[in-house]
């Protein structure tokens, strides 16, 4: 007898579960829930509208169940026994019987309607996103928007900081290259100045080396024969050989009229020697003065040239460029602080 009752309860449960999974039940219930779930939210307070909708739902469930139970011959007691049986307590059975239980329990009904409302919203958002490729601003969460804006600002800040650092590094590299270029240009200038001084010194030496020869030739061409006739040979022979040395003529070959110098008197030779010595000293002084003037001229000419090169290679920054550079550095420092603080 108990086995027959269990079999009967099992049959009733399976029969009801089959009906609840069928279109005769699922289509009208689903249509009602989708149409009425729009007003439901997850607030704790229950509105009057919720109660009215729940009453409508309860009437719909009773109508559908009564029609089915009459059709298969199940009375109300059998139905209640099947719903309270252990077979109806399983997880699968509870999921199937939830729409029926919601008709009797408002809490279950409200939770079901809120869940359906959320599912409908998510489905609508998914359809819009699939059609347009992006969601409108009105459907995005405020916190997500702020997060995206902050993320975009961080990207911009990092990019500005990177560009500022690159510009600063380029400026430093340009200054370093200018310093190296100036060092290279100054070194050849110094060498060229020294070479020019040496060349001028050699030129001065050659220039002043000629006058003694000219003096020698001029002195050699002078007619000294009349003087030789007035001087006695005995006096000439007794003159020391060292007194015959004339500046600029020590290494000159004695030939032609110059050989007649031996007949000159001692006093005359000394006068000649003194005269030539004065000339030599004067020429040496002139040579020294000219060399000094040339060095001074080269220094004076080299100084403006260096200044021009320095001005050309080192153009001073304008006030606007200085202000721009200062702003960049301040912005870089501010961005670094903000990035570090964040």
Curated annotation (Swiss-Prot):
Listed Gene3D superfamilies: ADP-ribosylation factor-like 2-binding protein, domain (1.20.1520.10)
Record-level GO cellular component terms: axoneme; ciliary base; ciliary transition zone; motile cilium; nucleus
Biased composition annotated in UniProt, kind: Basic and acidic residues: 179-189, 282-292, 300-322
Region (Disordered): 166-194, 229-250, 282-322
Annotated localization: Nucleus; Cytoplasm; Cell projection, Cilium, Flagellum
Summary of the tissues where the protein is detected: Expressed in several human tissues including brain, testis, heart, lung, pancreas and spleen (at protein level).
Positions of post-translational Phosphoserine modification: 85, 147, 201
Coiled-coil features, chain-numbered ranges: 150-187
Keyword field: Cell projection, Cilium, Coiled coil, Cytoplasm, Flagellum, Nucleus, Phosphoprotein
Subunit structure as annotated in this protein's UniProt entry: Interacts with ARL3.
Purpose: May act as an effector for ARL3.
Family note: Belongs to the CFAP36 family.
Name of the protein in its database record: Cilia- and flagella-associated protein 36
Organism listed in the record: Homo sapiens
